[in-house]
Amino acid sequence: MYRFLSGIKVVEIAGLAPVPHCGMMLADFGADVTVIDKKNPAIEQRLNRGKTMKQLDLKNPEDIKKVRDLCQTSDVLLDPYRPGTLEKMGLDPSTLWNNNKGLIICKISGYGQTGRMSQETGHDINYVALSGMLPTFSGVNATRPWPPANMLADFAGGGLSAAFGILSAIYARSHNGGKGCLLDCSMTEGVAYLSSFVQHYYDQPNLFTDKYALFSGECPIYRTYKTKDDKFVAVGAVEPKFYQNLFKLLNVDGRDLFVNPGKITEDLESRFLQKTRDKWANIFKGQECCVTPVLDIHEVGSYGQHVDRNSFTKTSSNWIANPSPRVWTQDELAALSSKK
């Protein structure tokens, strides 16, 4: 992995989910990340790839001074706490900027640093719920909204958004006289921003709100199907050329797709139950139908495409994703092209 962020120093106050994920991404691309954690933390931190660990007690004034000293020579401070917590410790922006005007202070919280809910507790499901997106993510026909694991707010709306903000602030610092800033990352707002496409097109009922809308979870050409071995394939045949290929290969009469989608769904369900997931994967290979196997976390790294690109690393229990995006230098790309 190319160390584009080499020379950037980050102080990460240990926390849950979004902050360690953000710190890991920065470390993956070369930043020098120091994690401040207490001895014997209640929760084991596993997103510490490439980081340096430092045990300090943030209730101890001497250790607070050590954090302040670290910030004096660092570029970024990652704050996982409820708004106002670091300020009570004497690690407020004014004090930190007096010692280091270039420090970028990134505060990741559920609802933001201001507003009537800034001090409220919550977790991923709460932030997604308040973003307005939970019903859409659950599907139009769901009997109740269900949370899609804890990835959307914590890691996309939180960690990933914060990393983008930090890199933007580092760039801005090179043009504003070296001044840092405070990044107020609300995970609720991060999910909402992530959902901009949905917001802009929500007035199109055939996309989101009709019973068989394209992204409702029930549309016959955009959903999952069970296979003979009780596994699943994913169908994403949105464009006409793709769903026409799908119907032809499966010998399904798709002329009533938009008139009687329920019947098309039944026909496709029946077809996919006739073979195993992996047999279907081989059948659809190269057929331009947008059909892929649904992989679980224990098998994902051994899938052919992922092996070709070394996308995952095997641990004792799971496959762990390698950093993304992949970087190709001009020389590497030229060498790759010459081999084709």
Curated annotation (Swiss-Prot):
Q: Kindly identify the residues recorded as the active site.
A: D154
Assigned EC number: 2.-.-.-
MF terms in GO: alpha-methylacyl-CoA racemase activity; transferase activity
| Pfam entry (one) | CoA_transf_3
Q: Which GO terms describe its biological process?
A: bile acid metabolic process
Q: Which GO terms describe its cellular component?
A: mitochondrion
Report if keyword Transferase is assigned. Answer: yes
Instruction: Tell me if Transferase is a UniProt keyword of this record.
Output: yes
Keywords assigned by UniProt, alphabetized? Transferase
The record's family statement is: Belongs to the CoA-transferase III family.
The protein's name in its UniProt record: CaiB/baiF CoA-transferase family protein ZK892.4
Annotated source species? Caenorhabditis elegans
Its lineage opens with: Eukaryota, Metazoa, Ecdysozoa, Nematoda, Chromadorea
